[in-house]
């Protein structure tokens, strides 16, 4: 079913059904079986409609090597976040009406700017901050991506921070994310 969802999503990207000029991009973190095997999930969303353009999971190294238990000490963990970000940017390029008018918004992470300039050199890239204090009067400029990220954490049990249901294989997480794309974008899948 996940393969059907991915094929349908690719078809809609190629046909131009997800065309946009305004994209929001972010990453969320989860883990594979244990917190010492972190996974980054790169996410690109149409800012007006909330439709998902791309979701890619990739492993990365733990930040604090000294606190890793002995059984994970010798384990090499590659950092493929940049590959996931580049895959998302290539999907954004497919969905862009025109690269000149494309606006990409994200949080203040320093990982995104180089990849955006390399893959989408003519697009405009804006780094925004969400308000720290949550008042009703405050406007969150990254509301749509933050909303989709929170729905992802809520709707997918394996994305929850503290849970009995954890991801054992990153490939299965990617399949689950592909199904979430189909659900969020309203695709009708027939087996």
Predicted regions, residues:
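Residue-level recognition of single "structural anchor" positions
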Residues: 1-191
